[in-house]
Amino acid sequence: MPRTQKNDNFVDKSFTVMADIILKILPTNKKAKEAFVYYRDGMSAQAEGEYAEALEYYEEALTLEEDTNDRGYILYNMGLIYASNGDHDKALELYHQAIELNPRLPQALNNIAVIYHYQGEKAKETGDHDGGEALFDQAADYWIRAIRMAPNNYIEAQNWLKTTGRMQIDVFF
């Protein structure tokens, strides 16, 4: 049974109805519509914590989706799942692929920075000060890129950049 028939939550039902209406009126080809259905079902499964199911839907959406920006969003969502499951290497791989396809994804840049920062903290905890600092520098690079795209977001990252001396004064102008 398609996920769209299983939604019992009002918001999910509303989203599904709206998405179905949009799919019917937008002048897109059949393949693009199918890709969107899988993407929508993947988002629904992901929101419910059904990560394995969400990944299956996203994989199918990737095989059908031709638009590079949309493929970037699919890969980004897949990265979210892997990151939440602790597979940071796979998440980084997917976030980097997402940015290659859709460079206007500050949220992917932010998530890459968060992972590098986390890895830097872990490296320092194990006594690898230089490795930790190198990872912090990588995190800073990605946060700066994200903040340049979305200057009103990532306030904590901006504060971290300032307090660690990793931010140039004019970086966000």
Curated annotation (Swiss-Prot):
Belongs to the Ycf3 family. One of its GO terms (cellular component) is plasma membrane-derived thylakoid membrane. This is Photosystem I assembly protein Ycf3. InterPro entries: PSI_Ycf3_assembly, TPR-like_helical_dom_sf, TPR_rpt, Ycf3/AcsC/BcsC/TPR_MFPF. The lineage of its organism: Bacteria, Bacillati, Cyanobacteriota, Cyanophyceae, Nostocales. It comes from Nostoc sp. (strain PCC 7120 / SAG 25.82 / UTEX 2576). Signal peptide: none annotated. SUPFAM superfamilies: TPR-like (SSF48452). One of its GO terms (biological process) is photosynthesis. Essential for the assembly of the photosystem I (PSI) complex. May act as a chaperone-like factor to guide the assembly of the PSI subunits. It comes from the Bacteria.
